[in-house]
Amino acid sequence: MKESTHKLMTLDFWRICIANFLLYAAVWMLLPILPAQCYLMGLNTQEISVSFLLFVGGMIGVGPLHAFLGDAFKRKYVLLLFTLAVALCFSGWLIVTAVWEVKLLMMLAGASFGIATTAGITIGIDITQSHRRGVGNRIYAFSGALGLLVGICCLSPLYLLLVFKNLVIISLVLFLLSLVVVTSIYVAFRAPVGVGIFNIDRFFLSLAWVPAINVCILSFGIGLLHNLLPPYAWIGILMVVVLAALTAPLTRLFVKLSHHCQRGTANTTLQLATQTGLILGLVEGERIANNLLFGCITILLAVLMFVTVTWPYFKQKRVRP
């Protein structure tokens, strides 16, 4: 029997948050260690950078398809299918040997992850009562940030203790658990409204382009700091914790720049900016000699941009009170 949605934390809402947490943890426990694994496979720095750019390109490239997929097909099935697709892409690291295979896997994984995260955001909103969707959106966004935090700071360091194959298996178990949780969620049927195949709705919030750039710069600096070795490694971990803690207030800021029915788009835009910056920072950190200096400078620039550009822009352009 379907549970009442008059309260926010319904069983289905808890389930979609748990599934989102598991999805992010599964992805982000592997992403930080893939550059090192690529080096072991014989890839050079340029090939690794291109591979991760393809991951980001995959996330961005499928963006115009989000609205169509969410309208033409059942969103729960879209989430299940593309979560499974991400899992299959990461399982491919157990057999991949050639550079072109790495690039293909990364591009497909990025595209699938982008669609899965957007489908999850949409479901999280759909199963929440309209007057609670603002709070629900922030809680859902934080569940992903918490998964990212656990993946980067708690699970990826296992690379120092376990062989890569075992880490992939752990990641696949998390993917499987996420799939199992999603199957138990009730999502009410919504009749298609006839959205075109290519549409930036549910992908990028145009009014949020300034804070999106700001978040991307901040995440880039944090990605650089995450590459630090002991005794400075704690700085990178601390900054990832800070980034996760900022997710809820940043989600609120992005949502206040959105019009009616654009909460999900605001969340998707924030997630895209955050993950793009982090991924680029993790990869470029392999090439930069002084990550501590450049990371701190980048974060300071991001803070300065927020105070002098983003916040005044937000006060001028905000749509919601």
What are these regions (language model features)?
Residues 7-51, 56, 209-210, 222-229:
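Helix-loop boundary and gating motifs at the non-cytosolic
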Residues 56-64, 148-149, 278-279:
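Residue-level signature of mid-helix packing/kink "hotspots" within the transmembrane helices
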Residues 61-94:
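Conserved MFS/SLC helix-loop-helix module at the cytosolic interface between two early adjacent transmembrane helices
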Residues 107-143:
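Cytoplasmic helix-loop-helix junction between adjacent transmembrane helices
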Residues 139-184:
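Helix-loop-helix hairpin linking two adjacent transmembrane segments in secondary transporters
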Residues 167-183, 295-312:
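Symmetry-related core transmembrane helices of the 12-TM Major Facilitator Superfamily/SLC fold
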Residues 230-250:
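C-terminal transmembrane helical hairpin of 12-TM major facilitator-type secondary transporters
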Residues 262-289:
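A late C-terminal transmembrane helix in Major Facilitator Superfamily
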